[in-house]
């Protein structure tokens, strides 16, 4: 066996390598695609009344309004990869691919936390690449007319990182207590994304909007950073991950299920 496969970390990276690389490339491409619009933003929005309604906010430049919404879209996409990595642990378990590992001194704790660690790292990389690609392309497209710099784009992206952690927490909770429900996390992600994306077009009650985790977060650069919200969502996410671990360390393995 390759040296890289002799550790749990190396094995997990190898198992997820293809999907990680594919998604990271997709984030760069999507960021660049949205970023290229910044050079001709006014024309782009005036050509479509619905887009204008979605991306225009009173008191803010078109670029700032657009960035707040587009970053939410990109970070929603970034959340898919960490969920897939956490769910992969169960699919490997179900296919009996982990049987030999269970027979060694490797503990469930190592398997769980390696999977969680890899999902968090992939989420961080995803935000970095998506925000960097969007910002770099946007600044290039705007030239000297732009009011935003690369720091604004990274701040807007990493401000939403707790939502990525929250989806990791939900996937971890499912993995630990009801692993066959892991796919439902994708449904909630889609629901949250659509609710936020179209919230400017549809008049929905506040309580309903707040069922989407993204609604809890300020939309930078239009809104100011809120440390209390950032920490609250992060702590809730960590709690979900820990509760997931308690279930995973106790439940029966679903080998061949």
What are these regions (language model features)?
Residues 114-171, 234:
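Secretory targeting signals
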Residues 1, 33-57, 184-257:
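Terminal transmembrane helical anchor/hairpin motif
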Residues 107-120, 225:
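Membrane-interface alpha-helices at helix entry/exit sites of multi-pass transporters
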Residues 1-8, 47-54, 97-108:
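Juxtamembrane inter-helical linkers in multi-pass membrane proteins
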Residues 160-194:
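A structural motif at transmembrane helix-loop-helix junctions in multipass membrane proteins
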């Amino acid at each position: 066996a390759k040296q890289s496969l002799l550790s749990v970390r190396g094995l997990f990276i190898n198992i997820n390598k293809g999907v990680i690389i594919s998604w990271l490339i997709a984030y760069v491409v999507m960021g660049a695609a949205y970023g290229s619009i910044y050079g001709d933003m006014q024309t782009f929005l005036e050509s479509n009344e619905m887009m204008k309604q979605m991306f225009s906010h009173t008191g803010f430049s078109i670029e700032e309004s657009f960035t707040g919404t587009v970053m939410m879209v990109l970070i929603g996409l970034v959340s898919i990869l960490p969920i897939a990595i956490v769910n992969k642990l169960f699919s490997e378990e179900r296919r009996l691919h982990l049987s030999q590992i269970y027979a060694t001194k490797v503990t469930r704790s190592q398997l769980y936390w390696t999977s969680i660690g890899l999902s968090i790292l992939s989420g961080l990389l995803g935000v970095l690449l998506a925000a960097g690609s969007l910002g770099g392309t946007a600044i290039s497209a705007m030239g000297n007319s732009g009011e935003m710099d690369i720091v604004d784009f990274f701040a807007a992206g990493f401000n939403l990182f707790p939502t990525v952690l929250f989806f990791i927490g939900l996937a971890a909770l499912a993995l630990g207590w009801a692993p066959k429900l892991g796919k439902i996390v994708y449904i909630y992600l889609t629901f949250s994304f659509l609710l936020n994306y179209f919230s400017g077009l549809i008049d929905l009650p506040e309580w309903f909007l707040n069922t989407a985790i993204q609604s809890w977060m300020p939309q930078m650069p239009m809104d100011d950073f809120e440390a209390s919200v950032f920490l609250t969502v992060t702590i809730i996410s960590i709690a979900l991950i820990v509760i997931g671990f308690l279930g995973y360390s106790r439940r029966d393995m679903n080998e061949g299920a």
